[in-house]
């Protein structure tokens, strides 16, 4: 599988996208809200992508819940991660939420929801209620259950944003944040460390944040954070994704091809470049044509179709509980 994940523009593939998807460097497609009209359209799109690619290809989406849920109509409305902490039955509900999110996507032939968020909430604009808590010990508790639910459904898990995005107010979608704390390894990073030690993470996504007490590069392009800390010190054996290299937080890494190459050389197995077709093509031309076998470990196993899933008692009961939690959260925070 190739090392580049990119996006498509709409509900259907256009001629240029059909050609791009067949390029040997392309190993993944990530969906956004603009790619979704209804389940029938989405299913047709995933089928077309797999047929066109004629090779193993990861199909991913950000379907965390709350404000980061790309597919809404005809899917369960998922609560943000923070909702679990604020419910007295939140531990059990977190596992059910992880299962439901994953099961619905797998039934649509989507391999991955890039989840869960393992950052501390703090006041970070990019994170906020996407975090389970502001307390790392509580994040470990809730995230572990959410992950177990995802794995029960059959989906690989992606922890983000290593070693922790929550300590900066700036949004890395809009600018390059700097975090000067020296204690991040003893604070934010303990969440990632625990989950790695307990074999709960299949993939990792680093932050577009410069931790300047340690290195002058964003973690997503830093061999210090990816090779030394994540691989050597924490013994992480899974896949490393870059976050979207079109984000402003990656601007300090150079041109689009330079960003992709820098992220790959720093230790990313798959680099992501979205919402910029010209930039994606630059990355496509700049990256070496290599096969990355570890990416195959994230492909979904065969599952039933969505119509079969929603007939099961487990889906019906879980959907009712998670929908209720989501509604309660929205009413409380509207």
Curated annotation (Swiss-Prot):
Domain of life: Bacteria
Gene3D superfamilies linked to this entry: Glycoside hydrolase, family 3, N-terminal domain
Keyword annotations from UniProtKB, A to Z: Cell cycle, Cell division, Cell shape, Cell wall biogenesis/degradation, Cytoplasm, Glycosidase, Hydrolase, Peptidoglycan synthesis
Pathway: Cell wall biogenesis; peptidoglycan recycling
Site (Important for catalytic activity): 171
A GO cellular-component term linked to this record: cytoplasm
InterPro entries in alphabetical order: Beta_hexosaminidase_bac, Glyco_hydro_3_AS, Glyco_hydro_3_N, Glyco_hydro_3_N_sf, Glycoside_hydrolase_SF, NagZ_Beta-hexosaminidase
Chief localization: cytoplasm
One Pfam match: Glyco_hydro_3
Reaction(s) this enzyme catalyzes, per UniProt: Hydrolysis of terminal non-reducing N-acetyl-D-hexosamine residues in N-acetyl-beta-D-hexosaminides
Cellular location(s): Cytoplasm
Single GO MF descriptor: beta-N-acetylhexosaminidase activity
Active site (catalytic residues): 173, 243
Chain sites annotated for binding substrate: 62, 70, 130, 160-161
Enzyme Commission number: 3.2.1.52
UniProt record, GO biological process: carbohydrate metabolic process; cell division; cell wall organization; peptidoglycan biosynthetic process; peptidoglycan turnover; regulation of cell shape
Function summary: Plays a role in peptidoglycan recycling by cleaving the terminal beta-1,4-linked N-acetylglucosamine (GlcNAc) from peptide-linked peptidoglycan fragments, giving rise to free GlcNAc, anhydro-N-acetylmuramic acid and anhydro-N-acetylmuramic acid-linked peptides.
Similarity annotation: Belongs to the glycosyl hydrolase 3 family. NagZ subfamily.
NCBIfam families recorded: PRK05337.1
The protein's name: Beta-hexosaminidase
Naturally occurring in which organism (per UniProt): Photobacterium profundum (strain SS9)
Lineage, broadest ranks: Bacteria, Pseudomonadati, Pseudomonadota, Gammaproteobacteria, Vibrionales
Gene behind this protein: nagZ
